[in-house]
Design a protein with these regions (language model features):
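Hydrophobic pocket-lining residues within nucleotide cofactor-binding pockets
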Residues: 14, 115, 150
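Active-site phosphate-binding strand-loop segment of PLP-dependent enzymes
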Residues: 118-171
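Residues at alpha-helix caps and immediate loop-helix transition turns in enzyme cores, especially N-
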Residues: 20, 39, 102, 123, ...
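Conserved PLP-binding active-site segment in aminotransferase class I/II-type PLP enzymes
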Residues: 1-80, 84, 106, 128, ...
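Flexible loop residues that form catalytic
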Residues: 69, 94, 150
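Conserved PLP-anchoring active-site segment centered on the Schiff-base-forming lysine
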Residues: 75-129, 133, 140
Length: 171
């Protein structure tokens, strides 16, 4: 019998500076919990500044928006990728429902990809098999791939990006 190996889940923690508590208190003290407020506005601007610096020194014109939930972010990303009711979207099977609900909100079909033993995240080999299976059965590739970094464990970004690039599917 194979020996089981424990996978430790990453628990939420504060940074060493504990600045998170300061900003949460400031948001409540100034009543800027909803809508967004100056901290979120500053974060959006700082992230846009960072995202718009091209490696060659030129400036890009990328837009940044903070959303209230990951579900909203996935939903917006799927819309931006042009997902339509007839499309299929690859998503890992072991995740929170927020990863697949936006797919069904748009009338598309989730294609669930099983996980690796080591990380519990999307298995790149099974992803590629599913992509080829969907192409054979439907005549087209899935429209998008939604990998998830579960419990603080990163998915194999290099392998998943290579597969996405091979089949020209946005991750």
């Amino acid at each position: 019998m194979e020996e089981r190996k424990t996978i430790y889940l990453c628990l939420a923690h504060m940074s060493e500076s504990n600045m998170e508590q300061k900003y949460v208190k400031e948001a409540f003290d100034t009543n800027w919990v909803v809508p967004m407020g100056p901290n979120v506005n500053a974060f959006e601007q700082n992230l846009a500044d960072f995202a718009n610096n091209n490696s060659d020194g030129s400036k890009l014109n990328r837009k940044v928006v903070c959303l209230s939930a990951g579900t909203a972010a996935v939903h917006l990303a799927l819309i931006a990728c042009g997902v339509q009711p007839s499309d299929e979207v690859c998503v890992q099977s072991f995740t929170f429902c927020a990863s697949s609900h936006p797919i069904t909100y748009l009338g598309a079909k989730p294609v669930f990809i099983d996980s690796e033993r080591e990380t519990w995240n999307m298995d790149p080999e099974l992803l590629e098999k599913a992509i080829l299976d969907r192409k054979e059965k439907t005549g087209k590739y899935p429209k998008v791939i939604i990998p998830v970094a579960l419990y603080g464990m990163p998915y194999d970004c290099g392998k998943i990006m290579a597969i996405a690039n091979t089949y020209k599917i946005p991750p």
